[in-house]
């Protein structure tokens, strides 16, 4: 779950499937830290499932979904995952889901606290999000 303004990663989960449960866990974790006016996602079944959308509705968050097959509608999230892949996953060649999870537990704090973004005037996501 990404704050688009600051690029701050509020929460994340990892799964070998595209089931709703792991996405809902990430959303619940993010909602413990912050709420938003709008939640944008693609139209994947995990994001359109009642279990997921009801969490958004219960927190008065407007649901916004990209057009089918339009990855550029969600450009900040797509860019995050490109960074994750090229800066961590492809370099480390994780062999198992558990190794990947452990590696990402180290990467996301780096991404939020240390990785500077040109679009943020070379500030970190944490600095923008917290100030």
PLM region spans:
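Charged DNA-binding/catalytic regions of mobile-element recombinases
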Residues: 1-131
């Amino acid at each position: 779950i990404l704050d688009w303004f600051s690029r701050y990663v509020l929460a994340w989960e990892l799964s070998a499937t595209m089931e709703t449960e792991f996405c809902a866990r990430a959303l619940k974790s993010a909602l413990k830290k912050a709420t938003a006016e709008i939640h944008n996602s693609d139209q994947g079944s995990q994001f359109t499932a009642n279990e997921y959308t009801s969490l958004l509705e219960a927190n008065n968050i407007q649901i916004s979904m990209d057009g089918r097959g339009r990855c550029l509608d969600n450009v900040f999230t797509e860019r995050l995952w490109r960074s994750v892949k090229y800066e961590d996953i492809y370099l480390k060649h994780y062999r198992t889901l558990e190794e990947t999870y452990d590696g990402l537990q180290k990467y996301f704090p780096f991404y939020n606290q240390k990785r500077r973004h040109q679009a943020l005037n070379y500030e970190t996501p944490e600095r923008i999000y917290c100030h």
